[in-house]
Amino acid sequence: TIDYKIEVINKLYILIDKVKKLIYSKLEVLSIDETLDYIIKNKCSVSRFGDGELKLIDNNGIFFQESSQELSSRLKEVIKSENNNHIVCIPDVFDRLDNYSEEPYKHWELHIAKTRKKWYAVLNKNKKYYNAFISRCYYAYKDKKNCEKWFEKLKEIWGNKDIVIIEGKKSRLGIGNDLFNNTKSIKRILCPEKNAFNNYNKILEEAKKIDKS
């Protein structure tokens, strides 16, 4: 059957990647604690990259954003940034996966098996990267005991601050939970839920109107 053939092909990808992993240099991805501590201490800008962003870099669309050469170029520019006040967060999935829950384990095992070469093409093996799972810890890890601590640290980033959330119209980030209950104030700039990058300049102009004093 087709499903059986796909399963065999996927297992072959994973087997081949076990060999590739021995050849490719190990990437340094810091822990969630190290990532959050660094952000809190340095008040830096943060960019998170995952499988969706890699698809867009590769000029392939995802569910809520069509591909474009301009978007691909801009994402490459960001992931390769050497700005001292900016960190790049990537999934900590290039070496070991045994600490992840079953579903994320299977997802990332196959994803990396198929895309390791593409990731390494845009990453610098001599650079220190930070952990993209700072906001996904509850989903990713088998051991959930640190999740509450991590979320409290995450909330320190915007604690007692006036914040602006730029989001899709239907995202409703933080509504119905206490994620932002420690902020001084919240403003929202609502964007199209699909293909928001097509309105990049309009969104940027709205963001520029916000008083940053």
Residue ranges with predicted function:
Residues I2-N181:
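Electropositive, gly/pro-rich neighborhoods at or near active sites that engage anionic ligands
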Residues S185-S213:
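Accessory, usually C-terminal, subdomains that scaffold auxiliary metal cofactors
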